[in-house]
Amino acid sequence: MAKKPVLTAAEAAKMIPDGATIMCGGFLACGQARAIVKELVKLGTKDLTLIANDMGRAVGPMGEEFFGIAELIHNHQVKRVIATHVGMTPEVGQQNTEGTLEVCLLPQGTLAECIRADGAGLGGVLTPVGIDTLVEESPFCLGRQTIDGKDYLLMKPVHADFALLGAYKCDE
């Protein structure tokens, strides 16, 4: 028996204010909450920070232009992205070069651990990954620590105001 949704995509999108930080699930737009993203596009919600593995796709599987969260980037509704991979969305690089989009790239495991650290209430994560790379220049890097002769980067937790996950079917 079909139940009425607890919340429609439009109602969910209206809960997200300008300037919010949103964590988005999925990989190459699979698993992203595309219905809510479409509603955010309609509402024109702006100055968003997106945290995701990637920034969606420049072209969708049915030929759609700017698939998933890439549509928010295309519409200049995003001011900052925190991701592990942005290569499938060339507009990210273009807007970053133009100075209209801040891009913070983190290794995939580091991003996952920094998200986990926030959820666990930890003050940070030590990782040997990213030493002497642009990761060390990230706003999430608090510096190096040496423990038992080995160097680590101390990374801040990554926090979001909202998390959007795509689902075909879910419970309350």
Where would I find each of the regions flagged by the language model?
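Conserved alpha/beta enzyme-core scaffold
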Residues: M1-E172
